[in-house]
Amino acid sequence: MSESAEHLKDEGSKTQSMIAGATAGLIARFVIAPLDVVKIRLQLQSHSASDPLSQRDLRGSPIYKGTIPTIKRIFREEGLAALWKGNVPAELMYVSYSAIQFTTYRSVTLGLQDAFGEHRLPAAAESFIAGASAGAVATTATYPLDLLRTRFAAQGIERVYTSLRSSIRDIAISEGPRGFFQGLGAGVGQIVPYMGIFFATYESLRLPMGTLNMPFGSADASAGVIASVIAKTGIFPFDLIRKRLQVQGPTRERYVHKNIPVYNGVFQTMRHILHNEGYRGLYRGLTVSLFKSAPASAVTMWTYERVLGILLKWEKSQELSK
């Protein structure tokens, strides 16, 4: 945790928050990229490995079961690089998202403090509002990159898109501007409570855990892991719905899963999944998602705190040298 700072949101300038957030996002994304590909493949799988009746219309689609077997199968059939499919738009998304998220979080919190003055909101409420606002703004601003990441990760041996440039051109021509925002409603519906719960939990744990003298400055990382697990489990169905909506359109039957159903809107998608796959269908990929989110949040928050601390020390040294 950075020195002499009571709250994450009070630390550093807007530029410092943006640099630290972007750096944290870049590093975290590369570390968890293979787990992200596995999660997306499992989320898009509408058939069950344990239900033969759901496998009647596979159309050549693979049957994935579990994190490790899925990693092995992707590696065997598509090669090592396949575990980083969609990493270019994902890196761009994570860097942009993290920078916007931390900057907005700080700005909203300071705005709330100015608005309420001496009658400041409780810390948990303040963190929830700032976190939810930051999540909504960052999600909307970077959503086209999120959609591209999903579509690239969903590609099997057959390549639907050959490059980032071609994917943007093809979607713009065949689906129009709205094609880049398919599933945005589910994305915002997911991220607002997620970020609110995440930051409120993180802020409530960060200072108490900071007094435990954990090795390697791991208190920030541990708080990030716990906050991420709690938040991710609560909103996971919306994340799955978002992924299935993102691969709708003229290329729907060309991804690794050839039998992805036609979905229209968040609630119709949820009803369809519940009717055909049951409640478990809404939680496909949850385990790997938690495995992914925990290290991602730990790396993100640990890196953010370290980079911000370095920037603050550098700024202080510059002031002293004048």
UniProtKB/Swiss-Prot annotation:
Compartments reported by the entry: Mitochondrion inner membrane
Keywords: Membrane, Mitochondrion, Mitochondrion inner membrane, Repeat, Transmembrane, Transmembrane helix, Transport
Main location (coarse class): mitochondrion
Pfam families for the chain: Mito_carr
Gene Ontology BP annotations: transmembrane transport
Membrane topology: Multi-pass membrane protein
One cellular-component annotation, GO: mitochondrial inner membrane
Residues passing through the membrane, by range: 18-38, 92-108, 128-148, 180-200, 221-241, 285-302
Positions in coiled-coil regions: none
Domain of life: Eukaryota
Ranges for the Solcar repeats: 12-111, 122-208, 215-310
InterPro entries from the UniProt entry: Mit_carrier, Mitochondrial_sb/sol_carrier, Mt_carrier_dom_sf
Protein task: Mitochondrial transporter that mediates uptake of thiamine pyrophosphate (ThPP) into mitochondria.
Record family assignment: Belongs to the mitochondrial carrier (TC 2.A.29) family.
Identification of the protein by name: Mitochondrial thiamine pyrophosphate carrier 1
Natural source organism: Botryotinia fuckeliana (strain B05.10) (Noble rot fungus)
Organism lineage: Eukaryota, Fungi, Dikarya, Ascomycota, Pezizomycotina
